[in-house]
Amino acid sequence: MFRLISPALVVVALVAAVPQESASRLPHLKVSDNHRFLVTEDGRPFFWLGDTAWELFHRQTREDAGRYLANRAALRFTVVQAVALAEFDGLTAPNAYGHLPIRNNDPTQPNQEYFAHVDWIVARANALGIYIGLLPTWGDKWNKKWGAGPEIFTPENAATYGEWLGRRYKDAGIVWILGGDRPIENDRHKEIIRAMAHGLRRGDGGAHLITFHPPGNNGSSTWFHDEDWLDFNMRQNGHSPEFTGHYDRTQADYARSPIKPVVDGEPIYEDHPVSFDAKKLGHSIASDVRRPLYWDLFSGAFGHTYGNHAVWQFWTPDRAPINNPLMPWQQAVEEPGAAQMQYGRALIESRPFLTRVPDPTVIVTDRVPTSVPGEGRYRFVATRDTDATYAMVYAPVGRTFSVRMNAIAGARIKAWWFNPRNGTATAIGVFPNSGERAFTPPDRGETLDWVLVLDDESKRYPPPGARW
């Protein structure tokens, strides 16, 4: 198991209203040549390990934002998702320094003092190696629905605001995330989003990727898959712990044509009321957030976003709680699920990255298919590389299952157990490549998940999760 090294806290001076390019600039991101993954501008694979911090710009001081970002950098998160025009009265409730984001509810009149604070947070995140997944606005500002609103966007001012943002953050390490938890319900909604995207492109010259954050149990592909500005699909598979009817949709987006990368930008949060019904179902725990990590990755996602129910809203006891957070954000950042996300990243990065594909046929269907590959919370999923040098099977529960050994090309197969709870790998043995073989996880508890890793022995890959 590798040991975490906390990154040094870099003090970043804000020398102008517009962030300036410096030696610490993060490389821009682009879509890989096979259209399945993200890579840096020099072609290195990029693992999206995101955290939802929707109210970061709106509610946090620089000191608290810095502490939060340092925590996430130490846990090897690579993206933080935050909103410029925030959800919770973001147009009328000022930020921690008393500044509103725009004047007169007019997106063409941004408040420089508010955005100087955004500048500072973006620069601090970038200095720590974290990209900001920047939402120009939460969705209630263009489709009020259940939010506070008001609806302030038109196609015309959305384009102007987008271009202004694009110019301001042209050199920053960001990804643009349009939308904000709202559906497209008419042509005007689509025109607003499209205009904002085109404005961003004009402003930053195409420097940054663009996606769309949809409402629950939906994906950007529903409305925008064929649009040129949409670089990759983002899903919100939602706050359910069930694979069936939720996380199975990641592979449906993976299979769409034309090919575009896909990521789950909002799965079930840790400590969240399960399916929004705490009285009946309680709150989610670490195992509930680990499962979607592997379900999504092994279904073809290029990364994954985590969230904690207290952290996204940066709840403290002096604030009105939204949907029953369990603890203040300062405590919630230490919840176990957050630390366990990095083990999924380490596992994927320890094997060839850009050739990975989902392959459920690695798993032998049990006599009772609802047992293996299973349904609900207990779905087994598998992935491998196109050269058949390795395969991985995620077992969400300690249940015996069988695999096709010839999913691997080598004559001899080295097998490992990888523990998603602590990132350790244990060698099982070396086996001939023939027939089907049953494996039983080391522990058989309900919340004790495991990953079986099968390697072509001749490749001499390091232990799963180890850095090359």
Across the structure, where does each feature detected by a protein language model lie?
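Bacterial N-terminal signal peptides that target proteins for export
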Residues: M1-A8
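A short, sequence-level motif marking secondary-structure junctions
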Residues: G50-W54, I408-A409, P432-S434
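Active-site mouth of glycoside hydrolases
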Residues: L26, V31-T244
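Short, ordered beta-strand-loop transition motifs
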Residues: K30-N34, R384-A388, F431-S434
